[in-house]
């Protein structure tokens, strides 16, 4: 029974997303840096952001975390380059608010996150949002 639930939660697609390590590893080149820990489960993430002219140019990260946090950080590190700092806090807050509802529809801008933001992973909400929370805190938004 427990194994079946585990298989349902962690899909091959989530593992594939998490295994993309193109932005893993800190370079000690950043305009903003933070380490954040999820007090509920112990997941930890450290981010390095390079920001210029109100745009995030790059995000590098290291985690000591579950596959959900790793997958979320991997996707976010690729997508974040398209985000404007002026709108990022509201966009992340709106995403968090709608994601609290099990019947939510993901905004098109975050469509790549649909494998993570679904009702099967609802109990991993804090793990999935740890990278988002870290970005907001690093930017002091």
What is each stretch, according to the model?
Residues 2-141:
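Domain-level signature for proteins that mediate thiol-based redox and metal-cofactor handling
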């Amino acid at each position: 029974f427990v194994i079946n639930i585990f298989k349902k939660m962690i899909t091959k697609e989530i593992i594939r997303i998490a295994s993309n390590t193109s932005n893993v590893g800190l370079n000690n080149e950043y305009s903003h840096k933070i380490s954040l820990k999820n007090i509920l489960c112990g997941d930890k993430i450290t981010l390095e952001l390079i920001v210029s002219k109100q745009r995030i140019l790059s995000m590098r990260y290291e985690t000591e975390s579950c596959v959900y946090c790793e997958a979320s950080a991997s996707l976010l590190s690729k997508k974040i380059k398209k985000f404007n700092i002026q709108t990022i806090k509201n966009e992340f807050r709106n995403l968090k608010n709608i994601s609290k509802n099990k019947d939510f529809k993901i905004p098109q801008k975050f469509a790549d996150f649909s494998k993570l933001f679904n009702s099967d992973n609802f109990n991993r909400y804090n793990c999935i949002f740890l990278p988002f929370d870290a970005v907001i805190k690093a930017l002091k938004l």
